[in-house]
Amino acid sequence: MLTKINKAIALVFVSLISFYQKWISPLFGPSCRFIPSCSAYGIEAVNKHGPWRGGWLTLKRLSKCHPLTPCGCDPVPEK
């Protein structure tokens, strides 16, 4: 039962990020300092680690995406 709930929550997270990528991000243009972009990172993190750890990794990544952090490659960690 918990696995089904986790899958449903992961689907909601990925759907929200995909909505952002399709409808909101184009209004602002590319602004992420990292490769992959923060939204692509979020989708990969949730798909790879599940909604809770993937969501946490995404929040940590978003907190680093500002002008005081150097640009670069920041892949999703392996399990």
Curated annotation (Swiss-Prot):
It is found in: Cell inner membrane. SMART domains: Haemolytic (SM01234). Its main location: membrane. GO terms for cellular component: plasma membrane. Keywords: Cell inner membrane, Cell membrane, Membrane. It is a peripheral membrane protein. Belongs to the UPF0161 family. NCBIfam families: membrane protein insertion efficiency factor YidD (TIGR00278). Could be involved in insertion of integral membrane proteins into the membrane. This is Putative membrane protein insertion efficiency factor. It comes from Prochlorococcus marinus (strain NATL2A). The lineage of its organism: Bacteria, Bacillati, Cyanobacteriota, Cyanophyceae, Synechococcales.
